[in-house]
Amino acid sequence: LGRNAAEALQMLQAVDKANVVGGYLEDLCYTPKFLKSLAAVKAGSIGEVIWTKSRETHPGPHSDWFWDKEKSGGGCIIDLGCHCVEISRNFIGKNIKPIEVMCWADTRVHPIDAEDNAIGLAKYENGAIGQFEVSWTFRGGMDLRDEVMGTEGTIWVNNFLRTGFEMFTSGKGGDYIAEKAES
């Protein structure tokens, strides 16, 4: 929630001093589609998670302050990447730490002093890879998709389709999968 580590620490100290719970709600982690996919992962339906991919792209923010790096703290990575990383952490496991991170970012379209496109990879201590794609230059509305690949299957979550949940498994997946799914 802070623009940098110092601001985040300042907020954490204020929360501790006030003896309250602090945080932010990552709402996409609580949608029915996501909860269904997370339950399938936890049940072992796709085996061991080896790779997650989260994409959040759109033409850019509505609020002017987002475009100002001094006010927002950065570009599309700080705006959208935080959501994608949290999606991956839910699938991979919140107690599993990243050990290596790399990112490519560039300003391609908007005349701003921050990135408007980025791709990042995080390798976790269990060998899983988390990938994010974020953009403020995507044309075609908003694109919000998540994938989780395991040793025994794959789940695709498209947050803008009616059903928007597909699972392919060679493991434990014989239960009800999605509303109006066709065989």
Regions found by a protein language model. Name each.
Residues 5-8, 34-35, 114, 145:
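Conserved strand-to-helix beginnings and helix N-cap segments that scaffold or border functional pockets
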Residues 86-169:
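Contiguous beta-strand/loop segments that form the cofactor/metal-binding neighborhood of enzyme cores
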Residues 8, 127, 177-183:
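C-terminal helical cap and adjacent loop that interface with cofactors, partners, or active-site loops
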Residues 142-143, 171-173, 179-180:
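Active-site lid/adjacent beta-loop-alpha segment flanking the redox-cofactor pocket in flavoenzymes
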Residues 10-13, 39, 119:
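Alpha-helical scaffolding segments of alpha/beta enzyme cores, especially the outer helices
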Residues 1-4, 27, 57, 135:
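Active-site beta-loop-alpha junctions enriched in small/polar residues
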Residues 2-20:
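Rossmann-fold NAD(P)-binding glycine/threonine-rich loop
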Residues 20-23, 28-112:
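Predominantly a Rossmann-like dinucleotide-binding segment in NAD(P)-dependent oxidoreductases
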